[in-house]
Amino acid sequence: MNKKRILGAALALFTALSMSAATYTFKIAKPIEDMKLQIHWCTSGEKSDLEVQNGVATLSKNDFTAQYVRVYYGRAFAMDLYLEPDKDLTVDCNAEAREFNCTGAAATINNYLIKSPFAVLDFNAAAKEEADFIKSSDSVYNANLALMKSANLPAYFVNKEEQRLLFKSYVMFPLYKSYHPYMKKMDDYTPTALYMNKLKELAVMDGNFLGYAEYGDFIMNAVFCQAFQGGDSSQELMAFMDANVKDAKVKTYITNAYAYDVVSSSGLDGNDAIVAYFHKNVSDPKLVDKFDKVCKQWEGLKAGCISPSFTATDINGKQVSLESLKGKYVYIDVWATWCGPCRGELPYMTKLEEQYAGKDIHFVGLSCDSNKSAWEKRIQKGDMKGIQLYLGTKSDFMQKYLINGIPRFILLNREGKIIKADAPRPSEPNITMLFDELLKK
C-alpha cells in the first residue's frame, strides 16, 4: 500500500471518529425468542451481535469507514446494506411478508440495495455452450448496471457499487467448468480458450476488493476453476497460488478459507501440506487461533487413535455398542432419512455390502434422525443391509467426531482404532481399494 493510500485511509477513519456515532435501528416484526441479529462488516471482517428487545435491535457506531455489510437474523432473513458512520438508518423488517423498508439519512442507498430486482444468472444457464453462456453472463451484468444507473444514487457510492455489481453478476461464471458437464451429462469437459480468457479477464487479484462479499465468493471459485485439474486438489491449489496469486490479501483469504474448510470437514490425516501452507501464508492472529483450535480438535481423531464410542438401538430395541463390534473392521455410515445425499449413497452401499459379504467388515448405519419413527419406517422396508442402529441427534459420538454435515463415513480397525475419521464414500472408487488392502492384513 502506498503512502497516499495509507494517509487517505487514516484521514477517513479520523474523520469518522470525530463525528457523533450514527445509529442503526432494526425493527423486526414477530421476533424470534433469543435470536440475535448479526452484522458482518465486509471490509473490516468484524461481526456485531445485537440483542433484539421488544422487536428492536440498535447499534451506535462511528469507528469505521463506510462499507458494505451483510445482516443476518437467523434463517428469517439476510440482506446487504451500506453503512456510513455519519448517517442514521432504520430498517423495518417483516420477513414473513418479505417486506423491508429503510428510513433515515442512509435510506436512498439501502432501499436500492434491499428492494432492487437484481438480475441473476439461473443455474440452468450452465447447460448453454460457452459463447451463449458468456453472452448471458454479460447480459446480467449490463441489466444490473442499468438498474443502478436508474436509481439516482449519490456519485460517491456509484463507483463502489459498479465494482460490486461486476462480481455479483458474474458470481456463477467460475462454476461453469463443473456445472456444464453435469448439466449436459458429459463424462469429460475441458473449457476452451474463449471461456478461460474471459475468466482470467474477470479474475482481478486485488485484496482491496475483499470489501465486497461478492468478490470473495467470486475470486475463490475463479482460482479453484483455474487450479484444479483432477489431481490432488491441495497440491494443485498451492502450486497455482504460488505461481499466480501475488496479492497478499487475496492469498491469505483463499488459503484461510480453503485450509479451514478442508481440516474442519476431513481432519488432519493427509493434510499436513495444506496445514503447513496455511501457517506460511496466514499471519492474522484471529485466523491463526481459529485454525489452530480446529486442528487441535481433530488431533484426537487421527489415524491410530482410539475411536469415540457409541451405544445405539436396533429395530428390535436391542442396545448395540461399538465395543461389541471389535474383531472386525467397522465401516460406519452416519445418515438420516431426510438427507438426499445420504439416500444417494444407499445403492452404492448395498453393492459394497454384497461385494464384501462374509468378509471381515461390519457395515454399520447410524441414524441421526430426530424423528425415530421415520427411521423405523425406513428400516422396516427391509431393503437396507448391515447393522442398522438409531443414534439420535444429540449424540456424544457425533460431537466428538465433529460431524456437522452428513453423510459421514468412518472406518475403524479390528481393535476399534481409527483408520479414517472421514472415510471415502461407497460411491468413491477408492473405497474398494482401501478395503482390499486392509483385508490382506
Short names for language-model regions:
Residues 1-26, 438-440:
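Bacterial Sec-dependent N-terminal signal peptides
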Residues 22-160, 164, 173-175, 182-186:
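A non-transmembrane, solvent-exposed segment enriched in polar/low-complexity residues
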Residues 185-200, 232-242, 269-279, 308-309:
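Alpha-helical repeat scaffolds
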Residues 251-313, 318, 323-328, 354-357, ...:
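N-proximal helix/coil linker or "cap" segments that precede and/or mark the start of modular domains
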Residues 326-327, 333-351:
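Conserved redox-active cysteine motifs that mediate thiol-disulfide chemistry
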Residues 344-382, 393-399, 433:
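Structural microenvironment flanking redox-active thiols in thiol-disulfide oxidoreductases
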Residues 382-384, 391-436:
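Thiol/disulfide oxidoreductase modules built on the thioredoxin-like
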